[in-house]
């Protein structure tokens, strides 16, 4: 049997034509968002607070600790936050402890850090009432990268990149000298940089790194300095030649590279450093040049000339101590915080610290007072004197007392630099050994250090030098092994750190000028800068997007989107082809098809269907492990491993292939990938196999049936256009699907899922109540309602519901007539009835663009590929009038209109909502309630009043006549201006709801706003000429004609065609999938079945023939059609079938626009552009040329002057028309005046002499010209 009948959810069954023996369940498609945010709450905040704690005052007297944090409960739930236009957030508090170092006094308090926006269960954020999504950013991982530069000769560049901190780079000049750069500063010779690390002689450098001709060249050019001189020179390069003492230079370099607060690799950076610098990763296929001695036994572990293959390297992994050596001693180790110079001042014996005598006087620099004389016994009292005056003391030892450092602990931590060193050689083309090469790696055990170490730097220099000896390999920056995702958790962590650094500085400044007794923790701490940064991130970051809520697929795709743009990412304008292009490592991780068309192409991608991220945020994808069966044959097991791009490199991974029933391979050789290359491999060498054919594409792309028959660019359009589908009034799932429709609907967040199993005890359009089995005996008023061991059935559940036992009931509120971000309708409909039993995670409602638990973006319609009177020329589409009458493509849209009353300045008047609107008829206010607000359910059209509002103008100086009239007729002394909210031009519909907020009701409103009224108007949009519809294969078009049913072509049985498509739209576009879908669709419709044809693994030609035969249709998929106008058959057979067509959001009603009188731009005084500004149509340069061509001088003059920006001419023309006079000659256009002013601003003298008056018109103001114009009239 070629197919299996599979049930998707509880409502839909499809005939699935997949040939795979295994079917791996898709992971949760939005967990990438929710899990990351949960991790941020659990670990991210704690780590940041730990990093900044304690904050210490400049004089060391006060310390502020952040011990713990907690989140308060949100004040408003998700629904309330949306209704009130506020952010769904929780207040983040921390337990702060202020400690006085001298007196050991402590003050504690819970302080508010910020209001933290919370993620919703569907992976979104509610910011100011609107749903937003923070998309993931793909960036280069911190780590070490070696790249090859091609010039006249090959050169290499090395970059040591942290997550936060100074970069280190090595490069080769045109003259072959080697240089190093720290923090993008000026270059320093590499040998001097090596000298800074503790190598003070040429011999020591050569014995450590071995002979390298380029390093030797650098050593000959630059004289080796001692270590201190090298450190001073490195500091001067970083500070533009500034010379400082060696201890200051050493301390600065220490803080730059080895201080955790300024240099951070994160766990991912340490992982990448260790991966790259492992000595055993570099020596494969080389020969050992020297015996390896086991230090434990003093015996030879490996003899020289041993060929280092994978097996030998595995042995070496457990004997790293055989090749671990100290390269730099503790005294010269740049990483040691306490150097030899400081240690000479102090006695290291802990018992004798108080007997230490100071060798020099300690002086207060500010006053010159001797605080402690030399040879004074150091007691606790003396130490307190040092602490109190610490900011005026420069002595090194006193500084360490002041900062309360534990000298002994620091001394204990002092150690030398250890590295793994192996000496190897390789063979030349003739098989002779080349000179010995020293390969140095870092210490792999230092996984906990998240800053760079001297061992790392030495190993990176060795790797760089080894590249010139053909050992090691360069990196592909675009490989996904070198790029990782920054998820919402990490992005928020970065923003938090940025805000806390600013706050830390402010707190330090306050601590330095405050006394412990006069301050409280709350007065000291101010995190307003953090709150501002968090708000800015969610409101205006390039990674925080206004949620695409038009349909469930658009929502889901946006949550799984990956962007290379944004802070710390790539600039769109400077991104080249290489970074936009598809890389072989993208396989099954990033979709090769779905990306935007336009300037962002290749920079924004989507995760593949099965992709997820590991703990370092590298993208992983699952593979099935290939094992040997009892007969020793390779067999696909059920064990799944998730692999990153780096881990895939060493495996042989087969593409999905057909298997025998026992999961062994049918062929001896199959297509597989190794090291990014695809080829034929023997099945014995296969280690993994893909879990599914659809794992290489994204969710949107995998919903396109017959994807494998479409050109890639058309598939891209198909995937993108599905996200633009408008939810229809009557949705219908596709007859021809791919089987993923159910999962898209379930994970999108648009539907309601049952939290627990139970019986439905109440269901209507507003809410659903599910009663679960109680976990204990229920007793009410001494009456046992339910015993724990009893069988639980619907009758018991109904009793519990009637008795209001809320502990075992879950209520689900349905969304009714809500407005989406794109102004479409969000409506949830119950799928369950009273008495139904539901399991946990079952879908209990349908939502927008879903039908019976499946995605339903469009409708299944009968299509024919034929021409009809030229109306479907150039992708135009002809549709049946039935599609309009029967609401097949009707959609509902909701518009929001808002008005506020504000507190105006004193004397400026008052704003109020009222029904008493001046100068309007009773008809205009008939639908307003007593407050002056439109009644829900009213039908409104363009210009109707929605909310009556008047603004009473401030007191004005009245004439004697006005005062007399007011006294006689009793009028108020101020005028009222009508400022009502009206339906805008071109809009209308039925008032769906009204929301009223006011400060009197204690609603949250901006300070100057008293009332806020929102009116929601719903309107049905039927499909019409000019609307855009499309299939799922990139086949799109605009409706050019709506034909009556009687004029349309019809089949032999009288069935009329719904849509006529142009057959010329198929061959050149190479999207043959639409033809196959059409044939399969009509066959499935005849058989009254639904089909699932998964991508790359669906219905093939043989299957299609069998289905067509089963449906008793012609094998060529064509049939005779009859002309509806004449009844005569068309000359030849026509391809007819059923295709799934969707209505796109590009509707003609949003674009149709006309202008009679409208606004003008302030500067140029030309008509505004665009529909929103009631603008005119631009008459541009090319249009002017066309009038030139016809010699239409008068029309051209009118268009360029009085119809555009000739202000005086406009007024004269209006006056002439109203008085029946001939049109006057035009004046100077305002744009010409602006141009002349620009020339004058450049210092040029401009004249425009009037031939009659001989005056310079440019120097005259517009007012003068207007006066002159009125005098002429």
UniProtKB/Swiss-Prot annotation:
GO terms for cellular component: DNA-directed RNA polymerase complex. Keywords: DNA-directed RNA polymerase, Nucleotidyltransferase, Transcription, Transferase. Its EC number is 2.7.7.6. Disulfide bonds: none annotated. It catalyses: RNA(n) + a ribonucleoside 5'-triphosphate = RNA(n+1) + diphosphate. GO terms for biological process: DNA-templated transcription. The keyword Secreted does not apply. GO terms for molecular function: DNA binding; DNA-directed RNA polymerase activity; ribonucleoside binding. PROSITE patterns: RNA_POL_BETA. It holds the Pfam family RNA_pol_Rpb2_45. It is an enzyme of class 2 (transferase). PANTHER family: DNA-DIRECTED RNA POLYMERASE I SUBUNIT 2. DNA-dependent RNA polymerase catalyzes the transcription of DNA into RNA using the four ribonucleoside triphosphates as substrates. Belongs to the RNA polymerase beta chain family. HAMAP family: RNApol_bact_RpoB. The RNAP catalytic core consists of 2 alpha, 1 beta, 1 beta' and 1 omega subunit. When a sigma factor is associated with the core the holoenzyme is formed, which can initiate transcription. This is DNA-directed RNA polymerase subunit beta. It comes from Phytoplasma mali (strain AT).
């Amino acid at each position: 049997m070629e197919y299996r009948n599979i049930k998707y959810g509880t409502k839909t069954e499809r005939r699935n034509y997949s040939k795979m023996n295994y079917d791996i369940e898709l992971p949760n498609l939005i967990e990438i968002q929710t899990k990351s945010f949960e991790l941020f709450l659990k670990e991210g905040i704690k780590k940041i607070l730990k990093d900044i704690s304690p904050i210490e005052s400049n004089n060391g007297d006060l310390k502020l600790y952040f011990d713990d944090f907690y989140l308060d409960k949100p004040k408003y739930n998700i629904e309330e936050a949306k209704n009130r236009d506020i952010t769904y957030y929780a207040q983040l508090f921390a337990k702060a402890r202020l400690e006085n170092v001298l007196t050991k006094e402590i003050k504690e308090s819970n302080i508010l850090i910020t209001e933290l926006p919370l993620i919703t269960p569907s992976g979104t954020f509610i910011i100011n009432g609107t749903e937003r999504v923070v998309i993931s950013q793909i960036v280069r991982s911190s780590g070490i990268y070696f790249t090859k530069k091609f010039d006249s000769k090959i050169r290499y560049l090395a970059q040591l990149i942290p997550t936060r901190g100074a970069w280190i780079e090595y490069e080769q000049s045109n003259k072959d000298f080697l240089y190093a750069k720290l923090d993008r500063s000026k270059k320093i010779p590499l040998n001097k940089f090596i000298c800074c690390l503790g190598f003070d002689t040429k011999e020591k450098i050569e014995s450590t790194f071995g002979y390298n001709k380029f390093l030797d060249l650098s050593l000959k050019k630059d004289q080796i300095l001692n270590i201190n001189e090298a450190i001073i020179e490195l500091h001067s390069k970083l500070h533009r030649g500034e010379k400082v003492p060696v201890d200051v230079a050493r301390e600065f370099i220490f803080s730059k590279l080895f201080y955790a607060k300024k240099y951070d690799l994160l766990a991912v950076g340490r992982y990448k450093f260790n991966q790259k610098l492992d000595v055993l990763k570099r020596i494969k296929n080389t020969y050992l040049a020297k015996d390896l001695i086991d230090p434990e036994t003093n015996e030879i572990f490996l003899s020289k000339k041993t060929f280092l293959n994978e097996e030998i390297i595995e042995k070496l992994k457990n004997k790293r101590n055989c090749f671990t050596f100290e390269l730099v001693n503790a005294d010269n180790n740049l990483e040691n915080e306490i150097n030899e110079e400081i240690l000479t001042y102090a006695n290291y014996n802990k018992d004798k610290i108080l007997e230490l005598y100071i060798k020099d006087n300690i002086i207060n620099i500010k006053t010159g007072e001797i605080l402690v004389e030399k040879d004074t016994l150091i007691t606790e009292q003396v130490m307190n004197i040092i602490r109190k005056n610490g900011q005026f003391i420069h002595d090194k030892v006193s500084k360490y007392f002041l900062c309360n450092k534990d000298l002994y602990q620091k001394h204990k931590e002092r150690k030398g630099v250890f590295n793994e060193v192996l000496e190897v050689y390789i063979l030349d083309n003739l098989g002779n050994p080349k000179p010995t090469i020293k390969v140095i790696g870092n210490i792999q055990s230092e996984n906990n250090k998240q800053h760079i170490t001297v061992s790392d730097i030495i190993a990176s220099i060795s790797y760089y030098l080894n590249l010139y000896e053909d050992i090691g390999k360069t990196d592909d920056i675009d490989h996904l092994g070198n790029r990782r995702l920054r998820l919402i958790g990490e992005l928020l962590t970065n923003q938090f750190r940025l805000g806390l650094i600013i706050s830390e500085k402010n707190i330090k400044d306050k601590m330095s000028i405050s006394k412990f007794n006069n301050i409280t923790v709350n007065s000291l701490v101010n995190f307003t800068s953090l709150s501002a940064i968090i708000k800015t991130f969610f409101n205006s970051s390039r990674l925080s997007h206004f949620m695409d809520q038009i349909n469930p697929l658009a929502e889901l795709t946006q949550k799984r989107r990956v962007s290379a743009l944004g802070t710390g990412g790539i600039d769109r304008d400077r991104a080249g082809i290489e970074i936009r292009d598809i890389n072989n490592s993208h396989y099954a991780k990033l979709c090769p098809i779905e990306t935007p068309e336009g300037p962002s192409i290749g920079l924004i991608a989507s995760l593949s269907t099965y992709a997820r991220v590991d703990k370092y945020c590298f993208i992983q994808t699952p593979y099935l492990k290939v094992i040997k069966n009892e007969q020793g044959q390779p067999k696909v097991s059920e064990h799944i491993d998730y692999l990153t791009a780096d881990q895939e490199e060493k495996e042989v991974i087969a593409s999905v292939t057909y298997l025998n029933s026992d999961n062994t391979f049918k062929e001896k050789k199959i297509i597989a990938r190794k090291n990014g290359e695809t080829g034929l491999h023997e099945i014995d060498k296969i280690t993994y196999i893909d879990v599914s054919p659809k794992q290489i594409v994204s969710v949107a792309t995998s919903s396109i049936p017959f994807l494998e028959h479409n050109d890639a660019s058309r598939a891209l359009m198909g995937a993108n256009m599905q996200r633009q589908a408008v939810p229809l009034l009557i949705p219908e799932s596709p007859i021809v699907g791919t089987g993923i429709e159910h999962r898209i609907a379930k994970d999108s967040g648009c539907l309601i899922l049952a939290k627990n199993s139970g019986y439905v005890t109440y269901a209507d359009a507003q809410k659903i109540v599910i009663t679960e089995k109680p976990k204990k005996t229920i007793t009410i008023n001494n009456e046992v309602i339910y015993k724990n061991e009893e069988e639980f059935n619907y009758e018991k559940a109904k009793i519990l519901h009637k008795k209001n036992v809320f502990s075992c009931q879950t209520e689900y509120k349905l969304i009714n007539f809500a407005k989406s971000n794109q102004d479409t309708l969000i409506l949830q409909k119950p799928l369950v009835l009273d008495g139904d039993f539901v399991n946990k995670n079952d879908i209990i409602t349908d939502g927008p663009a879903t039908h019976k638990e499946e995605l339903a973006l469009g409708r299944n319609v009968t299509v024919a590929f034929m021409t009809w009177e030229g109306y479907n020329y150039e992708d135009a589409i002809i549709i049946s009038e039935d599609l309009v009458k029967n609401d097949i493509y009707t959609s509902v849209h909701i518009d929001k209109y808002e008005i506020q009353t504000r507190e105006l300045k004193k004397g400026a008047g008052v704003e109020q909502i009222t029904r008493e609107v001046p100068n309007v008829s009773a008809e205009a206010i008939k639908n307003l309630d007593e407050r002056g607000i439109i009644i829900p359910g009213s039908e409104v059209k363009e210009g109707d009043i929605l909310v009556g509002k008047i603004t009473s103008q401030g007191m004005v100086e009245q004439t004697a006549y006005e005062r007399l009239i007011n006294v006689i007729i009793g009028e108020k002394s101020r005028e009222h201006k009508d400022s009502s909210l009206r339906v805008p031009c071109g809009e209308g519909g039925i008032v769906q709801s009204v929301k009223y907020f006011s400060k009197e009701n204690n609603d949250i409103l901006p300070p100057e706003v008293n009332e806020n009224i929102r009116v929601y108007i719903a309107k049905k949009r039927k499909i019409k000429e000019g609307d855009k519809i499309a299939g799922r294969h990139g086949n799109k078009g605009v409706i050019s004609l709506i034909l009556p049913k009687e004029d349309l072509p019809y089949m032999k049985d009288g069935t009329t065609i719904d849509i006529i498509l142009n057959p010329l739209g198929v061959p050149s576009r190479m999207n043959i999938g639409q033809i196959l879908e059409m044939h399969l669709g009509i066959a499935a419709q005849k058989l009254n079945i639904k089909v699932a044809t998964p991508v790359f693994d669906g219905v093939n030609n043989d299957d299609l023939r069998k289905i067509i035969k089963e449906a008793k249709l012609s094998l060529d998929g064509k049939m005779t059609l009859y002309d509806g106008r004449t009844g005569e058959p068309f000359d030849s057979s026509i391809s007819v079938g059923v295709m799934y067509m969707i209505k796109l959001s590009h509707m003609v009603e949003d674009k149709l626009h006309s202008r009679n009188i409208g606004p003008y731009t302030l500067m140029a005084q030309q008509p505004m552009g665009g529909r929103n500004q009631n603008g005119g149509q631009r008459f541009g340069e090319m249009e002017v040329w066309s009038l030139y061509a016809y010699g239409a001088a008068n029309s051209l003059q009118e268009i360029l002057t009085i119809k555009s920006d000739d202000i005086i001419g406009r007024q004269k023309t209006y006056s002439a028309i109203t008085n029946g006079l001939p049109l006057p000659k035009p004046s100077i256009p305002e744009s010409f005046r602006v141009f002349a002013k620009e020339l004058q601003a450049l210092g040029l003298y401009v004249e425009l002499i009037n031939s009659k008056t001989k005056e310079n018109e440019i120097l005259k103001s517009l007012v003068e010209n207007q006066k002159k114009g009125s005098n002429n009239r």
